[in-house]
C-alpha cells in the first residue's frame, strides 16, 4: 500500500511540475498527505533532490532561460542536468 502511495505521489508531482509548480509546493503536499514517519522524510528528501536537478534542461531548449528569467532576471545556460544563471558554458 505504501509503495503504491509513493508511486502515485511521485507521478502526481511529475505531472504538476510541468505546470510550473516549485519544490516548496511539493514539500507542502508531502507534509499534508503523508503522516509523520520515515516515509515522509524519504519523500521530502527525494522531492528536494529532484527539485535541485532540472530534468527539463537537456530536453527543452529554453527551459534554463525561462527558469533564470523567472528567478534572477539573467540569461540561463544548461550545465549537464542543472541550470546556471548568468554563467555560460566554458568549453
Curated annotation (Swiss-Prot):
Which cellular component appears as one GO term in the record? extracellular region
Q: Which UniProt keywords apply?
A: Disulfide bond, Ion channel impairing toxin, Neurotoxin, Potassium channel impairing toxin, Secreted, Signal, Toxin
Q: Where in the cell is it found?
A: Secreted
UniProt organism field:
Buthus israelis
**Where on the tree of life does the source sit, at the highest rank?**
Eukaryota
Q: What is this protein's record name? A: Potassium channel toxin BuTXK-beta
> Matching InterPro entries, A to Z?
Long_scorpion_toxin_alpha/beta (IPR029237)
Q: Which residues form the propeptide?
A: 21-27
Reported tissue expression: Expressed by the venom gland.
Q: Tell me the protein family, please.
A: Belongs to the long chain scorpion toxin family. Class 1 subfamily.
Amino acid at each position: 500500500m505504501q509503495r503504491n502511495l509513493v508511486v502515485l505521489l511521485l507521478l502526481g508531482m511529475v505531472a504538476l511540475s510541468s505546470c510550473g509548480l516549485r519544490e516548496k509546493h511539493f514539500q507542502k503536499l508531502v507534509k499534508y498527505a503523508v503522516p509523520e514517519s520515515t516515509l515522509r522524510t524519504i519523500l521530502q528528501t527525494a522531492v528536494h533532490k529532484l527539485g535541485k536537478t532540472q530534468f527539463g534542461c537537456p530536453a527543452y531548449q529554453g527551459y534554463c532561460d525561462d527558469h533564470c528569467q523567472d528567478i534572477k532576471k539573467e540569461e540561463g545556460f544548461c550545465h549537464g542536468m542543472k541550470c546556471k544563471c548568468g554563467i555560460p558554458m566554458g568549453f
